[in-house]
Amino acid sequence: MENNNKNYSHYLHSGYAHPITRSWQGDKVILKSQLIYPIFVTDLINTKTEIKSLPGQYQISSDLVVEFLRPLVEKGLKSIILFGVIISGVKDEQASSADKRESSPVIKSIELIKNEFPEILICTDLCLCAYTDHGHCGVLTEEGFIENEKSIIRLGEIALSFAKAGAHVIAPSDMMDCRVGQIKKVLFQNGYGGRVAVMAYSSKFASSYYGPFRDAAGSGAKHGDRQAYQLPIASRGLGLRAALRDEAEGADFIMVKPAGPYMDIIREVKDHVKVPVCCYQVSGEYAMIYHASVAGGIDLKSGVMESLISLQRSGCDIFITYFTPQLLDWLKL
């Protein structure tokens, strides 16, 4: 006689046997509007150079950035984040090249992009490391230590320059204490508080996955490292504390960086903050997936999509990824 005492709730296959019912099992689909593409803009002229450690990514002079973006905009690109790269200009202790129009590739690029593609959301990375002669993310004391208060004042000045040029989102990546509050104060004092958002690199860890990026941005520290201000990789508590602090100081968006190895932090942050959470799939993550596909270890599209769906499942709302050009081809909406 057949046993009718089965617990049918343990049988799962029927709930995802059809493509449509499979789609119902996920919370969301990833949209093109959730993607932010990182762009490295240089102070050179008429130059586009592939970054060896980031295949398929380029350092682009600001005069070429519009034509570089045009085919991506036609495919549905909605958002970018600009990183300045000083090659021919001067780097100094105060990061002077960051906010002088004649020397800042970011300011020049903002103006050009905004004029040609007014619908594009322009985010600007905000840090001193790419512009200082020592390569650290803040102003240093004579002894070589970070001077936090002077650093956040300088960051506020640069943020205001980016806002005046037309940036929509300022994204401080420096990891100075309390810089979000200083940036928000400067923006409000100058009439930009209600128009320019702050996306804080809040839970940013002192990761080994940043290597290709530092090649791209020319932002490696000349001495020491950044472990005194970027978060310890083992610390879950600091990851949450930094996010809660930045939210309390007025951050409109919170970022976790890197992404894949820190999905527990993404979930923790998502469960505690009331603002959207962004994750940065950093250069080392990109390189691993890219080279695994080149070696035949994984299918590129499947690997990229799985990585982003996993990040979304962990709580990510916005994705900064170097795979954006491919995703614009793969995603329908």
Curated annotation (Swiss-Prot):
Please tell me where 5-aminolevulinate 2 binds in this chain: 283, 322
Q: Bound how, and how many: what does the cofactor note say?
A: Binds 1 zinc ion per monomer.
The active site of this protein is located at: 204 (schiff-base intermediate with substrate), 257 (schiff-base intermediate with substrate)
User: What are its E.C. numbers?
Assistant: 4.2.1.24
What are the alphabetically sorted keywords of the record? Heme biosynthesis, Lyase, Metal-binding, Porphyrin biosynthesis, Zinc
Function description: Catalyzes an early step in the biosynthesis of tetrapyrroles. Binds two molecules of 5-aminolevulinate per subunit, each at a distinct site, and catalyzes their condensation to form porphobilinogen.
State the name under which the record lists this protein. Answer: Delta-aminolevulinic acid dehydratase
Give the species this sequence originates from: Dictyostelium discoideum (Social amoeba)
- The protein's gene is named alad
